[in-house]
């Protein structure tokens, strides 16, 4: 039996459209917010969110569409944050005065360190203590080409999920499990943070396709942008991520293992994984270098990975090289602007101290 709850969906980009449609079609009350009032108006004028594609299809009617974040948050049982991870901090500051004890906040996904950053900012803004969850990746493979429409190519079969405090994960899954059975509890948010495969699959391939992105010639990001050599180098970046996790006594999946868990594939290489994934057909590459594959996945992926590696004395030469090359390429000091350990509330902590902070 599906239990009805009220879900706030904050952010109506690709993933937010998919979440709002999915939950409404599951019979849940959906309070949807976006900062862009014009986008909200266009969805209101359309009268619904139309979901299309092999992953999800139907006409969904959220109970509320608003650009007033307080209206969306104050009466929700579960608050789903579905904005680029670089905006998590501002969302936390903006909702701090509206949230109340007993609410569940989930970052979809948290990238690396999302729940930790969110908790720190809520506390700094005087918010009550609430449970903050995060997933390791986005549930949907989807694209919204215009307000009120979303194409859902696939829904992942399983999603790593953890909470702050770590012991609240079971309670959280009791709240959402009837509509989000894909969420599977792992040890803690350090595990979900170190299972951030976007940090492997986005910055490096985009860097190696920079000329193609700037040329304006359309290309399929995964199917054409990740060649055997690009995939092979991504596997070496992935090995550094896994080494960091092992230093924290965490067993996180490799990217290839993640594809098996998420999509039911059994690839031997990253190249095989992307070529064999029908959900990636038609996903276009960036048309310039002002892309979230840099600004989000370097800031909230490579930066905290590099800093976590340094904290536990794990060398990350490839992660550092990609981070620094992209910083120089687009004249952005990601090491300053990104998610540093200080911004996560972990500055100066040992491996044991960091593990304690995520309990």
Swiss-Prot record:
Keywords: NAD, Oxidoreductase. It catalyses: (2S)-2-[(R)-1-carboxyethylamino]pentanoate + NAD(+) + H2O = L-2-aminopentanoate + pyruvate + NADH + H(+). Pfam families: ApbA, Octopine_DH. The keyword NAD applies. GO terms for molecular function: opine dehydrogenase activity. Its EC number is 1.5.1.28. The keyword rRNA-binding does not apply. PANTHER family: BLR6086 PROTEIN, OPINE DEHYDROGENASE DOMAIN-CONTAINING PROTEIN. Belongs to the lysopine/nopaline/octopine/opine/vitopine dehydrogenases family. Homodimer. In the forward direction also acts on secondary amine dicarboxylates such as N-(1-carboxyethyl)methionine and N-(1-carboxyethyl)phenylalanine. In the reverse direction, the enzyme also acts on neutral amino acids as an amino donor. They include L-amino acids such as 2-aminopentanoic acid, 2-aminobutyric acid, 2-aminohexanoic acid, 3-chloroalanine, O-acetylserine, methionine, isoleucine, valine, phenylalanine, leucine and alanine. This is Opine dehydrogenase.
């Amino acid at each position: 039996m599906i239990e009805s709850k009220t879900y706030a969906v904050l952010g109506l980009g690709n993933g937010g459209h998919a979440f709002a449609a999915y939950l409404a079609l599951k019979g849940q009350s959906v309070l949807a917010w976006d900062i862009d009032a014009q986008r909200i108006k266009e969805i209101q004028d359309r009268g619904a969110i139309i979901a299309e594609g092999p992953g999800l299809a139907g006409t969904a009617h959220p109970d509320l569409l608003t650009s007033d974040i307080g209206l969306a948050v104050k009466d929700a049982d579960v608050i789903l944050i579905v904005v680029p991870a670089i905006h998590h901090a501002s969302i936390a500051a903006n909702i701090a005065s509206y949230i109340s004890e007993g609410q569940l906040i989930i970052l979809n996904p948290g990238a690396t360190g999302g729940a930790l950053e969110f908790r720190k900012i809520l506390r700094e803004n005087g918010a009550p203590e609430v449970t903050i969850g995060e997933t390791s990746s986005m549930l949907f493979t989807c694209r919204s080409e215009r307000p009120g429409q979303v194409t859902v190519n696939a829904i992942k079969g399983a999603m790593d999920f953890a909470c702050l405090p770590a012991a609240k994960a079971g309670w959280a899954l009791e709240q959402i499990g009837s509509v989000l059975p894909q969420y599977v509890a792992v040890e803690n948010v350090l595990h979900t943070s170190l299972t951030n495969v976007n940090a492997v699959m986005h910055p490096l391939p985009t860097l190696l396709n920079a000329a193609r992105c700037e040329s304006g010639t359309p290309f399929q990001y995964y199917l054409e942008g990740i060649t055997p050599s690009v995939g092979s180098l991504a596997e070496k970046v992935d090995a550094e991520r896994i080494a960091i996790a092992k230093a924290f006594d965490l067993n996180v999946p490799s990217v290839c293992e993640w594809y098996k868990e998420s999509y039911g594939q059994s690839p031997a290489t990253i190249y095989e994984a992307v070529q064999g994934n029908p959900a990636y057909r038609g996903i276009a590459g960036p048309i310039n270098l002002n892309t979230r594959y840099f600004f989000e996945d370097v800031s909230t992926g490579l930066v905290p990975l590099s800093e976590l590696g340094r904290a536990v004395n794990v060398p990350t030469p490839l992660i550092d090289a990609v981070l620094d090359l992209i910083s120089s390429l687009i004249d952005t000091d990601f090491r300053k602007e990104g998610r540093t350990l200080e911004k996560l509330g972990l500055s100066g902590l040992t491996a044991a101290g960091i593990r304690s902070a995520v309990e």
